Every structure is written in C-alpha cells, then in structure tokens.
Amino acid sequence: SGLFGRYHGDYHFENILMTNRNKNFLLLDWRQDFEGSISIGDIYYDLAKLLHGMIVSHPQVNLNRYKIKNLSGKTYINIFIPENLKKCRIYFYKWLKKNNLSQYKVDILTSLIFLNIAALHHTPYNKFLFNLGKIMLQNSIENKEFYF
C-alpha cells in the first residue's frame, strides 16, 4: 500500500535546487500526473527516486565510474558513491524510521525503478542498472542489507 499525498514524480537531486538568498528549495521537472491525478501520488515513489540518486549518481555515471563483470557465470557490479551520498543515505534511512516510513517499501520501489529504467539506457550501463535492480530486489525481499 502506498502513501498518497502531494508528490513530484521525478524527485532526484538534479531536480532539486536551493536558493542562495533565503535557502528555499525549488523543485524542477514535475511529473504531469499520477494515474490521471495532478494533485496526489505515491510519496513512496518520490522517496524511492531520491534513494535511486543516492546509489547511482548521474555525475559518476557520466564519468564511467561504474563496473559490471561476468565471471564464471556470476555477475559483479560496482559503482563509486561519493562520501556525501553515503552519509546522505544513512541520514535518509534514519529519517524514514523517525517518521514511521517503511525502508522496505522504499528499497523495493528503488529496485523496481532500476529495473524499469535499464531498458532506456545504453550498453553496458543498461546491464549495470538491470543487475543492480535485481540484486537490490532480492536483498530487499530476503531482508538483507544492501551495501555499495
């Protein structure tokens, strides 16, 4: 079950700006609707999109700082995650817990986002995203921690 409320739809760091003058946040590139509604959507989806950006940073992808290898029938993946995003994810999980939000739901949706967007990207990045989504989904279902 979702948590419905005002939502963004493409909530990741590249779509969040902070003004210098009064430190307000501006959100860019709002999704036009969620299943036909322009006023409400699933907040868990926005939280999952934010977590997606903490794990896979577009600047790191643009610098080719991710890897995928197949050895003896097993797939291994890795991506460089800047220290600030690692800390951000720790605070994010604490914030979820403090606000009685489900980390499990956020992790499941994040893994589904990776699986869903994989087909939209070039090789080998698409294979990296697919395997990341698959590994994260399996770990989430089995209640295992997911580390990078």
Language-model region placement:
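Active-site acidic catalytic loop and adjacent metal/ATP-binding pocket
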Residues: S1-G41
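Active-site activation/catalytic loop segments of kinase-like enzymes and analogous catalytic loops
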Residues: N24, D33-K94, S111-Y125
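Regulatory N- and C-terminal appendages and interdomain linkers associated
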Residues: N22-F25, L101-F148
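Acidic, serine/threonine- and proline-rich low-complexity regulatory regions
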Residues: G36, L96-K105
